[in-house]
Amino acid sequence: MFFQAHRPGIHGAFFYLRSQVGILSDFHLFRENADRLFEKSEKKSNLYRFFTGIENQIPQPQITPMSRIRFRSKTRDSEMNIFTDPLSPWRLPLRFLYPANWCAEGFEEDLAWIQAHPEARNAGNLLTDSSGKQVWRVELPDGRGVVAYKHCEGKAPSRYILNLSHPGREWRNYQAIARLGIPAGEVLAFGETRRHHWRILNSFIITRFIENTRDGTDFMPGGRRHGDAAMRRRYCMLIAPEIAKMHRHGFFHKALHPRNILYRGETPESMEVFFIDVARCRMRFQWTMMQFLLFDLYTPLRDLKLPADEARAFLKAYHDSSPDCPFTLAELEQRLTCYRRHGKVFDVVNGAPAM
């Protein structure tokens, strides 16, 4: 019958209950909960106003634009913009959010010299030459140091109409690597050239050259140090905690080939490792990292073809450095003994051939 009250619907029901003696004897508790529930609401509901009798005592919050939403970083206490910060999984590769050209402070003169003397760059040591990408070792004048100059052609121009260029992504990923405290190359400058502000013609990135280093292909079958078990084991023990650190913060490398992980030192005790070529890296949400971390572990194990005991030691070092790993050590080994890739099943722990 109380639905026949003056206030129709749900309001009529509560009007009837309010008129009954003792029904809302603990009304002050309801009001306290209502204040806590609706204090961040832009508009107070009719139900809230009906019970509390107040409408404008709580200040209205300001609506924050989506582009200014911020959150706390896992690695620092300061706030960050979730769409541009290098450690945010929300960050977008849109080139309008980032500079088209960037130079480290104090490197402007050297950058101008490199751009004005392309013959000096081309005369340097050519480190790699792949499809649309060349990397040179360039010595700066007056003994100001040595840099690595990577030049990329405008390959697949439609892919970069709205997105960052290949060096632009690498510059952004190096920022994340530096924030995590992982040893890697230091970016000094990057830039790109576009036609009509849309089609990318070429781009470049300059990093400080890491002297006296070699890449991890030395430890692959046929490599210069493949038979040096002590150096190979030390190499794996050094990169495992760094990979775990990446994954703990949602950093998916996507290209953990030994050629992209340099080492320096002639003895296991003096060895250091450095990560390079991070253009393909992505930030991912933690709940999606299961498949990505398996791929990042599969890649170096497949390339190095480690003996079973060394492969298990590598996984144990990774797991010990990753307390939030979604797998137990046994589950991690089991997943990588039957890892499916391109329709084939790989056993990268025991070194069995693909099936």
Regions flagged by a language model, labelled:
Residues 6, 12, 17, 29, ...:
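Short, low-complexity, charge-dense intrinsically disordered segments
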Residues 79-123:
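Juxta-kinase regulatory segment immediately upstream of eukaryotic protein kinase catalytic domains
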Residues 113-214, 248-249:
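Conserved ATP-binding subdomain of kinase catalytic cores across diverse folds
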Residues 173-176, 180-183, 213, 219-254:
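Conserved kinase catalytic-core helix
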Residues 211, 258, 280:
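Short, glycine/acidic-enriched loop or turn micro-motifs at the edges of active sites
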Residues 256, 261-263:
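Hydrophobic residue at the +6 position relative to the catalytic HRD Asp in the kinase catalytic loop
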Residues 263-269:
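Activation-loop N-terminal segment of eukaryotic-like protein kinases
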Residues 271-351:
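C-lobe/activation-segment region of protein kinase-like
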